[in-house]
Curated annotation (Swiss-Prot):
Mg(2+) binds at D495, D501. Gene3D superfamilies: GHMP Kinase, N-terminal domain, K Homology domain, type 1, Nucleic acid-binding proteins. This is Polyribonucleotide nucleotidyltransferase. GO terms for molecular function: 3'-5'-RNA exonuclease activity; magnesium ion binding; polyribonucleotide nucleotidyltransferase activity; RNA binding. Its main location: cytoplasm. InterPro entries: ExoRNase_PH_dom1, ExoRNase_PH_dom2, ExoRNase_PH_dom2_sf, KH_dom, KH_dom_type_1, KH_dom_type_1_sf, NA-bd_OB-fold, PNPase. It comes from Cyanothece sp. (strain PCC 7425 / ATCC 29141).
């Protein structure tokens, strides 16, 4: 292929698209670059496997540490399992890509995005999303694109396209918008309690930039003489399809019209209809065209039955403005909440129920040393808030092997984490590392937003002083032609058979997280805006129910949580606290039973099983790092004796000398006549000489001063 390069500029920030240079055997290849961040994206297609009734699309995002001039850690010095961030970027690429493939496509498709060079200020994720579209188009795969993505930041009052890491950190918004010529396809955002209207304007602003990238891809295809692939869907047997529809439509319509609130009852009724049709096919003659067609296409019954159910469910919503469980379009399912559902050895817990969706959230408070250290290409080095999401098979009444968390679980945990980070207390006010685990015990839609709600309550139960509580709701969409219905608090069947899953989380002040996924090729900005606005009253209703259970964070943490105290020292004194080879800090730990974490800034966090131990360690460190003044009185221990005096350690790591003339108010012939190694003595700082040597005395100490020194040690 001829080598071609395209440049697109946004406010002086260029994106370079290069094709024809790399990976010539891949179906489609593009190198996409901005600054020094370069991502190679390939798309490859293979023939459909027999018996597949879904699109086997596999998207992998990979990072190479050489991209940042680093060698991997570990014994092998080689990249291993992709970090969580790579999994999230894989999902970010997949989500806007998947709905643009024709629904009938069954070919194996693999998209691989590899970051080959990393600019410490330019994120690679949105480049990878746009690059995936170019690669798929070049691979000549049927695709309703082009598609592109940009990031929108908010610094001050100004929106920025593709902000740097520094601008993202300094701003109040981190939003990714992906779109096609038909409209918005995907939105992912974290925000600092931003008003709905500001978020809507940001999406609008971002989509305008997306359109520029779409035009650039169209121009690129024109230059190369490549047209979008038009391919007809495989033929279907109308005889079999009509047989199934004739026997399914009436009973399915009747079942949906019952407005059954229990999904298990509704699903069982639908399964009975499906089983009856299957039995009717089996009872036909072996030579009957319907039975012959069914034998050739084992998935025909399931697929057609799903289409019938989908059509009738959607028609019921469009024509009757009523949902399968009888709710109005903007009605939230019944909500109930409990806090403290687990014993207090669990530092905080809550159970959140919304309809048949039930999430148990549990909080663990840890020490700064429990923070997650990140080893990837991204600038964050550690995380003090961790949110993990588990979705066991029993939550949907199924059986399957339970393995390590999948992409969906990692993604849902990250969404809940993003929703809550903006309301966490600053580290200097609440130094704990916080881990929340959301266990989905029952699922009928919107478990990620159930995790947000349950986790808010569990954090409050744990005594975490959130600045504001967060609630979340999932919005859905039914679109037939020009008719559009937005659904509040969607359940499983509405997610499965609907066109959109739009999760919105936030406080009463604004949005903290968004995630929108589509099943159609694009959505107008007007409908996106309506969905965001319609979510607010739902969120406020849910929040009201939550606060009826627990109105504010508890004043005390669990008695089983570690006790933490903070202390700030001069960074130049860190070496004094640590001591040679860590001797001093180890000694404090052994003496008090406390754990001590020291940051380069001089911030020290002391943790212990009870507060007295932590305070004792703080007292020792405060004593050894405070500036000494002549006249200060301490309790010390004689460490060694020389002919002219005795050395006394009066603070950890601090020694001074009592000259023989300062041991007593009478003549002392030998130091050993007055003190021995190991003796406890009361000393006063006499002077600190020009070389920093501390001279001590036992003379002139008032009884009150001695008593105060002993009391300080006892405390």
């Amino acid at each position: 292929m001829t080598e071609v390069e395209k440049k697109i500029s946004f406010d002086g920030r260029d994106i370079h698209i290069t094709i024809g240079r790399f990976a010539p055997q891949a179906g489609g290849t593009v190198m996409i670059r901005s600054g020094d961040t370069a991502v190679l994206v390939t798309a490859t297609r293979a023939a459909a496997r027999e018996g597949i009734d879904f699109l086997p699309l596999l998207v992998d995002y990979e990072e190479r540490l050489y991209a940042a001039g680093r060698i991997p850690g570990g014994f092998l010095r080689r990249e291993g399992r992709p970090p969580e961030k790579a999994t999230l970027i894989s999902r970010l690429i997949d989500r806007p890509l998947r709905p643009l493939f024709p629904g009938w496509l069954r070919d194996d498709i693999q998209v691989v995005a590899t970051t080959l060079s990393m600019d410490e200020q330019v994120p690679p994720d949105v480049l990878a999303v746009t690059g995936a579209s170019v690669a798929v188009l070049l691979a000549q795969i049927p695709f309703n694109g082009p598609m592109a993505a940009v990031r929108v930041g908010l610094v001050g009052d100004d929106f920025i396209i593709n902000p740097t890491y520094s601008e993202i950190e300094a701003g109040d918004l981190d939003l990714v918008v992906a779109g096609s010529p038909a409209g918005v396809v995907m939105v992912e955002a974290g925000a600092n309690q931003l008003p709905e209207q500001d978020v809507i304007e940001a999406i609008d602003f971002g989509y305008e930039a997306v359109r520029d990238l779409i035009r650039a891809q169209q121009e690129l295809l024109t230059e190369l003489g490549i047209a979008l692939v038009q391919q007809d869907p495989p033929p279907r047997d109308p005889t079999l399809e009509n047989f199934i529809r004739e026997r399914a439509e009436a009973p399915v319509k009747e079942i949906l019209a019952r407005f059954e609130k229990d999904k298990n009852v509704r699903d069982a009724a639908l399964d009975e209809v499906k089983a009856a049709i299957e039995q009717a096919i089996k009872e036909l003659e072996e030579t009957d065209p319907v039975r012959v067609a069914a034998a050739l296409d084992a998935k025909a019954l399931s697929n057609t039955f799903k289409e019938v159910t989908k059509t009738l469910m959607r028609r019921q919503v469009i024509e009757g403005n009523v949902r399968v469980d009888g709710r109005k379009l903007d009605e939230v399912r019944p909500i109930s909440c409990l806090v403290g559902v687990l014993p207090r050895r669990v530092h905080g817990s809550a159970l959140f129920n919304r309809g048949l969706t039930q999430v148990l959230s549990a909080v663990t408070l840890g020490t700064p040393g429990d923070a997650q250290e990140l080893d990837d290409l991204h600038p964050d080095e550690s995380k003090r808030y961790l949110h993990h999401y588990n979705f066991p098979p029993f939550s949907v009444g199924e059986t399957r092997p339970m393995r390590s968390p999948g992409r969906r679980e990692i993604g849902h945990g990250a969404l809940a984490e993003r929703a809550l980070v903006p309301v966490l207390p600053p580290q200097d006010q609440f130094p704990y590392v916080i881990r929340v685990v959301s266990e989905v015990l029952s699922s009928n839609g919107s478990t990620s937003m159930g995790s947000v709600c349950g986790s808010t309550l569990s954090l409050m139960d744990a005594g975490v002083p959130l600045t504001k509580p967060v609630s979340g709701a999932a919005m859905g969409l039914i679109k037939e032609g020009d008719e559009v219905r937005i659904l509040t608090d969607i359940q499983g069947i509405e997610d499965f058979l609907g066109d959109m899953d739009f999760k919105v989380a936030g406080t009463d002040s604004g949005i903290t997280a968004l995630q929108m996924d589509m099943k159609i090729t694009g959505l107008s900005l007007q409908v996106v805006a309506e969905a965001i606005q319609q979510a607010k009253p739902a969120r406020m209703h849910i929040l009201e129910k939550m606060l009826e259970t627990l109105s504010q964070p508890r004043q005390e943490t669990s008695p089983f949580a570690p006790r933490l105290v903070n202390l700030k020292i001069d960074p130049e004194l860190i070496g004094l606290v640590i001591g040679p080879g860590g001797k001093t800090v180890k000694g404090i730990t052994e003496e008090t039973g406390a754990k001590i974490d020291i940051e380069d800034s001089g911030m020290i966090t002391i943790s212990a099983s009870d507060e007295d131990k932590a305070k004792r360690a703080r007292s020792i460190i405060m004593g050894m790092t405070r500036k000494l003044s002549a006249g200060d009185v301490y309790v010390g221990k004689v460490t060694r004796i020389i002919p002219i005096g005795a050395f006394v350690e009066f603070l950890p790591g601090k020694e001074g000398m009592i000259h023989i003339s300062q041991l007593a108010d009478y003549r002392v012939n030998k130091v050993e006549d007055e003190v021995s190694v190991g003796d406890e003595v009361i000393v006063k700082v006499r002077e600190i000489d020009g070389r920093g040597r501390i001279n001590l005395t036992r003379l002139g100490i008032h009884p009150d001063e001695a008593a105060a020194a002993r009391a300080a040690v006892a405390s």
